[in-house]
Amino acid sequence: MASNPPQPQGPALTAHILNTMSGIPAAGVQVALFKLNESPTPSQQFIATTETNANGRVTSWNVDLSTVESGIYTFRFETGAYFDSLGVTSFYPYVEMAVRINKGQHYHIPLLLAPYGYTTYRGS
């Protein structure tokens, strides 16, 4: 009996941005991912980039992230450019958040965004 090959699990890191000012998904937000290197001196290594789709979701990256290594990663969401494109003044030029990633797990980062504030949490 032949076994079925494993199915791709998709990216290990996804996100979803909702514009809480308008109540709609934040489409077209540029997102970058960096890995923190802690020794000998702290620095960040660029890993990947993407853009939120029409539903405000990050579902793919410009590189394969299905097997990211454990470590501390930083998401950088270019929120200022997003609000500029809407003609809305905002306080934050970008939102950056550091998260601890364990290899083999999926991480979903929801971002509830407004011009003068934001909320985030680990989603499922």
Curated annotation (Swiss-Prot):
Cited CDD domains: TLP_HIUase (cd05822)
GO molecular function: hydroxyisourate hydrolase activity
Gene Ontology terms describing biological process: purine nucleobase metabolic process
Enzyme Commission designation: 3.5.2.17
Gene3D superfamilies: Transthyretin/hydroxyisourate hydrolase domain
A cellular-component GO term for this protein: cytosol
Keywords of this entry: Hydrolase, Purine metabolism
Catalytic reaction list: 5-hydroxyisourate + H2O = 5-hydroxy-2-oxo-4-ureido-2,5-dihydro-1H-imidazole-5-carboxylate + H(+)
Record InterPro entries: Hydroxyisourate_hydrolase, Thyroxine_BS, Transthyretin/HIU_hydrolase, Transthyretin/HIU_hydrolase_d, Transthyretin/HIU_hydrolase_sf, Transthyretin_CS
SUPFAM superfamilies, alphabetized: Transthyretin (synonym: prealbumin)
Class in the EC hierarchy, top level: hydrolase
Domain of life: Eukaryota
Residues annotated as binding substrate: 16, 57, 121
Pfam families, per the entry: Transthyretin
Family, as annotated: Belongs to the transthyretin family. 5-hydroxyisourate hydrolase subfamily.
Leftover remarks: HIU hydrolysis also occurs spontaneously, but more slowly.
Subunit text: Homotetramer.
Cited function: Catalyzes the hydrolysis of 5-hydroxyisourate (HIU) to 2-oxo-4-hydroxy-4-carboxy-5-ureidoimidazoline (OHCU).
Protein name: Probable 5-hydroxyisourate hydrolase
The organism's taxonomic lineage, starting at the top: Eukaryota, Fungi, Dikarya, Ascomycota, Taphrinomycotina
